[in-house]
Amino acid sequence: MYKTFIARTKSIFLIALAVAGASIFMTNKNVTVASAESTAANPLLDKWEGPYGGIPPFDKVKVSDFKPALEEAMDQNLGEILLISANKAAPTFENTITEMERAGRTLARLRTIYGIWGGNMSSPEFQVVEREMAPKFSAMSDKITQNEALFKRIETVYNSPEKAKLTPEQQRLTWLQYTNFVRAGARLNPEQKARLSEINQELAKNFTKFSQNLLSEENDKFLVLAFEADLAGLSQSLRDSAATAATTKKVTNAVGIISNTRSSVDPFLTYSERRDLREKVWKMFVNRGDNGDAKDNNATISQILQLRAERAKLLGFKTHAHWRLENTMAKTPERTMELMEGVWTPAVARVKEEVADMQALADKEKAGITIEPWDYRFYAEKVRKARYDLDQNEVKQYLQLDKIREGMFWVAGEVFGFAFSPVSGVPVYHPDVTVYEVKDKKTGKHVGLWYFDPYARDGKRSGAWMNAYR
């Protein structure tokens, strides 16, 4: 769906968009960031070149390049970390915390592209790489957080009286590094650390399996609309979308299909007059990963819960929730539930009122039904029409994609002083993607590039999100 650029603050927005500046940083002039041979052979390890301060080489990416590039970048990162931990000089913010921030730039840049392929361009070939690399990423992370010499340096900086002389930002960064290491098991004994690493790798495998199963369910399952009568209630645009989806999936002898994604399911549940088909579509969507087949996620979920519980106990927490919330504003599961119940209780009460309105309308029409989940959107639209004379189809002409995008640009211009203009010649990872240069509206100074990828497709996970390339 839409990859919006909305951010909480201007600084976050700038981080998301900024592409200027160096891509590779070295912690020591004697460290080779990448060998000439491997860099030449694998474009994923290359520094981002070209205009706008360097741009991702999406046009050169091959799935087969990911594994060797990632493994080399991981080795580089570990080498940088070892240099920091082996430093004979007394630990300071500059030679420890700052150097840790500089370490791993090559890997971070590479994982940006890797993440884009995982969320936007997944394929069976790429998923093989994901399954192999997930536990390796976890093992590498544990090697860093379980490095005793490195943790001692961080701890020394954290407990040093000199910390008071640091800026608030530096103190915050020091606190984050120290806290993250402690939460990752830096204080455990060797036996506990070994078990923790095993748990983390198993979790990484299960998270990957869960995500891939869910994506497969969305890509492979759909409802066939075999007859013209199956389109009852759908607007022409929705009929066209269903027909296009059928063509894409090479489904013949059908007037269309409803894909197992929210962008396809929600409009069908809202407008289809075929209650029997609405039920099938609703169940298809909510039962993703819960069909007792090869893509069923129930056993995976159970394994994740067991591993999380064991990890929490190992780290000294009552439950995974206690560990997860310990460094957040809510702090505890109990406080979190209080916050949730404060919203949940009135929300449920309001939903019951809405369902009562829907049921009254259905009874008035002598529909002879009891409102079920697959009726909710359909009857919500009918109630809205009856009560307010508001038809969403009449509003749609003002909500075309181009107009929504222009509205986003206008808001960014008013709030942040940004101006957007389309650019060509910038590599993209899919033909759907369009690129815009962002400038300061007053000075004309380059701020960054914005990549817009609005459409659902096979291999792209559902939902709405934003990636920061650099």
Describe the residue ranges of each PLM region.
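Bacterial N-terminal signal peptides that target proteins for export
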Residues: 2-14
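Bacterial N-terminal signal peptides
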Residues: 12-24
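Signal peptide processing junction and immediate N-terminal pro/mature segment
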Residues: 24-37
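N-terminal helix-rich structural modules
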Residues: 37-237, 245
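Short His/Asp/Glu-rich catalytic/ion-coordination signatures at enzyme active sites or charged loops
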Residues: 50-65, 114-133, 156-198, 257-299, ...
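Active-site-proximal, well-structured secondary-structure segments within enzyme catalytic domains
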Residues: 169, 173, 205, 212, ...
